[in-house]
């Protein structure tokens, strides 16, 4: 590399010398000589400059990747590496690998025995839930050991919502469950209830005997419960049975209410006698003149105005 660099520099310097020599000869009126020196000098200078410019760029060489790696390893290591790579590439013949893949595919579980059975609402799924063990022997050729497979059968019960017709039939067939007396039914209003008109009306509290009569009637005697059995409509009209029970309860409660009504009449008479006295006291304006008056008229010092 150093020799090439010095040669390029000498080539350029020689071209410059030929140019200067041609200029000197041109001053002595010899055109046939200095033209030759000018042409040779210019060619040498241009060639040297282009050569130097091409050497500045890096050279592109294709070097294999294994060459550097092979230079670092010894020949024994290279031979061992080649044998190991050959073993890894083909550990078994191709037909052996295909046979192993086929055996693995056969060892996978088979899901073809799964069956689906749609059961009705009234059917009992308990017999299907009992697990059963079954053994199956795979067909094998002569001289090969028989492989036995065991699997367990289990049933999966999926509960789906019944249609309205099926639900009504099942409710009519099955007896309605008795509701607990501790939990009270929820109350709900009608959608078309007029709130403004209900506020203007005077509140009419329901008698306590009506609630007692409702509690005495068992829930089972009211017929099969509907889908919204836990809700009680406030504006619902009473049933004929409830009306009969309410009438009986009111007839039984009449003799017990008679002494209470007499007592209320006596209290109203006493209150009416006290009301006139309170009205007379309210009409009086000023301090009352009574023997217990702390400020009598004599001590007040009032004197009548005498008009003279």
UniProtKB/Swiss-Prot annotation:
GO terms for molecular function: chloride channel activity; chloride channel regulator activity. Palmitoylation is necessary for activation of plasma membrane-inserted CLC-K/barttin channels. It is found in: Basolateral cell membrane. Pfam families: Barttin. Residues 172-183 have a biased composition (Polar residues). GO terms for cellular component: basolateral plasma membrane; plasma membrane; protein-containing complex. This is Barttin. It comes from Rattus norvegicus.
